[in-house]
Design a protein with these regions (language model features):
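Transmembrane beta-strands of outer-membrane beta-barrel pores
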Residues: 29-33, 57-59, 68-72, 104-108, ...
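Residues on the lipid-exposed face of transmembrane beta-strands in outer-membrane beta-barrel proteins
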Residues: 49-55, 87-91, 119-123, 158-162, ...
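Outer-membrane beta-barrel domain signature
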Residues: 36-42, 72-78, 106-110, 143-149, ...
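Outer membrane beta-barrel
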Residues: 76-139
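Repeated loop/turn-to-beta-strand initiation elements of outer-membrane beta-barrel proteins
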Residues: 21, 59-64, 95-101, 127-132, ...
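Outer-membrane beta-barrel transmembrane domain signature
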Residues: 148-154, 169-202, 211, 332-393, ...
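Residues that define the transmembrane beta-barrel architecture of outer-membrane proteins
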Residues: 41-49, 80-85, 113-117, 152-156, ...
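Beta-barrel outer-membrane channel/assembly domains of diderm bacteria
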Residues: 18-94, 98, 411
Length: 424
């Protein structure tokens, strides 16, 4: 209650001094059936109320994003639950150089993205950008609290980017994320394997991820683009990932893509899985797309993945048009066998007022090439988007799935969106 009163007081204060208030409100209903046992199931209707609310005064903003969720039937133990995803203060263009954020805010990072409670600063000058952040992990279920034991649950990092060379972008980044797991007890044998087992307290350290990342991006108008990234794991002292993604357009309407990556499994340093023996993978993918006309494009891709003692392949071909898409996908080898066909169509009528959509897919798969029996999966979806005015939309979608595990699985989703932008 105290937190709610403080929030209402802060909200009233921000309302008085704001020049602009904008954001989006969404209300959703999700209906599904959950099986608790072989012949026992319950039907649920779950509601989500989301609000993205921003108060703005010149170059200063307070941004928030939170969600209230709960069941309308068969209530769960923790219902209702309020999640705070964003709640931070932002000051932009300080001395035409810096932007500062303070509070619960998002972080975009290939190693450990998400949200955190803390501070970040962003500098931009000509062809140079630099950002740094420091804070703590968010409590479970995004509660409006500061996590206990900040020293063992923090993350810090930075990112430097420059475009000083024509057609190039260079980036160097660092992240250090700590998260201390809850201690627990386990039964262990003594080294002699004879003495009676003993109960041992297990308490791991907090160091989870520590990475250095390098990126190089090159583009030459519409002819060629190449993106290269490299991740080095400082905890394990080894390369975690190296990837190259390239695209070239040798002639008009034809594009050729090539992708390569070397990848180690991303294991938390303080996880029990860190002591296991694991191997890396190599992946190569080649693809092409050809634009037959202004509204029709043919796409094809083939990839090979090399594991320690085996390999797997995947093949995909498709047709993309202004009315929808048609795709076929096949995988074979160590990763399992799969044949899948999918068709999707969506089109807008009456100047955006009505957008119906429909899709169907059929999949035949084996989890292992040695399996004698294959499984079938059929999926259907149908939906409609209604936008009577630019700021208001309604979405309704029905999903149906059927295989030997989920028989006649039917789900229904409804969503209302309202955007607002008020100048005071």
């Amino acid at each position: 209650m105290k937190k709610l009163i403080i929030l209402l007081f802060c909200g009233a204060s921000m309302l008085l001094y704001s020049q602009n208030i904008n954001g989006r409100f969404s209300s959703s209903l999700y209906s599904f059936e959950r099986y608790d046992a072989v012949n026992s199931s319950e039907k649920y209707i779950r509601a989500y109320e989301m609000l993205n609310l921003n108060f703005n005064y010149e170059n200063i903003s307070v941004r928030s994003f939170f969600n209230l969720e709960g069941n309308l039937s068969n209530k769960m133990e923790y219902d209702p639950r309020l999640r705070f995803y964003h709640l931070y203060f932002e000051a932009r263009n300080i001395l035409d150089l810096a932007t500062i954020k303070l509070g619960r805010q998002p972080i975009i990072n290939s190693v450990a993205g998400g949200i955190f409670d803390g501070a970040s600063v962003h500098f931009k000058k000509n062809d140079y950008k630099f950002s740094a952040y420091y804070g703590a992990n968010v409590p479970a279920y995004q509660k409006l609290e500061i996590i206990d034991d900040w020293s063992d649950n923090y993350l810090l990092g930075g990112r430097f980017t420059t475009t000083v060379l024509k057609d190039f972008q260079f980036t160097v980044a660092y992240i250090n994320k700590n998260f201390k797991p809850q201690p627990y007890q386990a039964i262990r044998l003594l080294p002699d394997l004879v003495t009676n087992p003993i109960l041992v307290d297990i308490e791991n350290k907090s160091n989870q991820f520590e990475f250095i990342t390098g990126e190089v991006f090159y583009t030459n108008k519409n002819l060629i683009s190449v993106f290269t990234s490299y991740d080095y794991d400082l905890n394990f002292n080894q390369t975690s990932k190296f990837a190259v993604d390239a695209r070239i357009q040798p002639i008009e309407r034809l594009g050729i893509n090539a992708y390569f990556n070397y990848r180690q499994p991303k294991i938390r340093y303080n996880s029990i899985f860190a002591v296991f023996d694991y191997a890396n993978t190599y992946e190569v993918e080649l693809g092409a797309d050809y634009q037959i006309s202004s509204g029709i494009t043919v796409i094809g891709k083939f990839a090979n993945v090399e594991y320690k003692d085996d390999n797997a392949q995947r093949l995909g071909v498709g047709l993309a048009t202004q009315w929808g898409t048609l795709n076929y996908r096949k995988t074979f080898g160590y990763a399992g066998e799969l044949d899948a066909v999918s068709v999707y169509s969506g089109y807008t009528f009456l100047e955006g007022l009505l957008t119906p959509s429909i899709g169907v897919s059929y999949t035949n798969y084996k989890l292992s090439p040695d399996d004698s029996e294959s499984n079938n999966l059929t999926t259907l979806l149908a939906g409609v988007n209604i936008r009577p005015i630019r700021l208001l939309s309604f979405d309704l979608q029905a999903q149906y799935m059927d295989n030997k595990i989920y028989k006649n699985d039917f789900r229904l989703f409804f969503k209302l969106n309202y955007w607002f932008n008020i100048n005071i």
